[in-house]
């Protein structure tokens, strides 16, 4: 939800000064200033995303995932939503009104999401600090010495970030709020891959391999040596702490069920997710029934197409025929392009 809002705002505020100059009235200017305020806040709230979009000044930092920061963030988004809803929409042009609707919808969704403990779902096999730290370092700019100094600063701050993640994971575990155990199966090996015995093989060091010509060989060697020192003295112990916690406490006691509804207040949480991802007011059961009816309708239409074609055989035989008969395959790139165009 946060990423969707920042993408919307990126499109809106990327030409902020120009947009402000061409705003039709004071209300549209007020709206643009609110958008810019939200954007600036989001960039400081998530420094890793700020790095991703090229926002300056955040490259040495990590997000604050503490409970206090989560609560403060929710309150801030309530403030933004209240400001946004005070805008007189009757005075907005069509484009500005659409911008208002998109941002309002996303902010409202963020505030609604704060009723559920997503902040505890910080790690699984597809994401978490065991992958995210190295990934963030790899996408940082490498244009000059300051860029590499930012990487060193971010490396220095990473151990505290890992410890903060562990604290939140521990709190979530105590409350019975974890990802399904099966989604954590590969996490220990992912951690080990991040901290191999030979630090030169660590993905944490991979961003220190492509230096610009403006950095001398001596400076390059000094930067690499400092990176290795930080990684071995600070990050290796922090990741080992995470590894022990995952293997001895977290994974053995994580949720065995894959159903979100089995979590505390899970049914309401699941229904919220349904609304969030389908952007409809349909219930989970209504969506399930709709899916069944659509499958039945589509299958009936497919059976009719098979019957009308004159094919004699079962449905599975017909699909096998479609997959294997040469008449359904192009024999050249030109035929493929011609078939696409025609």
Cite the ranges covered by each PLM segment.
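Positively charged n-region of N-terminal signal peptides that target proteins for export
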Residues: 1-4
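Bacterial N-terminal signal peptides
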Residues: 6-17
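N-terminal maturation segment of proteins
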Residues: 22-342
